[in-house]
Amino acid sequence: MRLVAVVAMGQNHCIGLDNRMPWHIPEDLAHFKELTMGKTVLMGRKTFESILATLGRPLPGRPQMVLTRSADWAPEVVGQDPITRALSLEDALEMARARGLDELMVIGGAEIYAQCMAQLDVIEATEIEASPEGDAFFPALDSAEWVRTPGARSESKGLGYTFVRYERRA
């Protein structure tokens, strides 16, 4: 099973401030949807709650695993797709393997990305040409461990960005 992170980050690796993304790039959201639709996504509880606050519902079309330290936690809403609680990364990976998943998409936040880094196979990143203030950051990437393949540079509302794929070196 491949473990794939999907992330939008600034040049300073910022991914968020106060549980929100510090930019709004519609093309990035469409790219995220294209990468994750129909696949199981793994996220932390704070990311799940941030999605609920923003969308008013869980992400549609994607079974969701929420990683939390709280054995009592349960989602307050029920989506069309299953929402599963995992108490550890190992627990989440075991559930994913038991379901026969080919890929598990890791969608944040910062603590979850940090926990998964050593096991990630691929990182699908949107690299944004800004260094916003933040309180959540994606871990640093060692070029000795990752092969970087950038796509074409684009702009949205005057903000430059590039979709980049990182694959772990063999």
What name fits each language-model region?
Residues 1-170:
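Enzymes that bind and transform nitrogen-containing heteroaromatic metabolites
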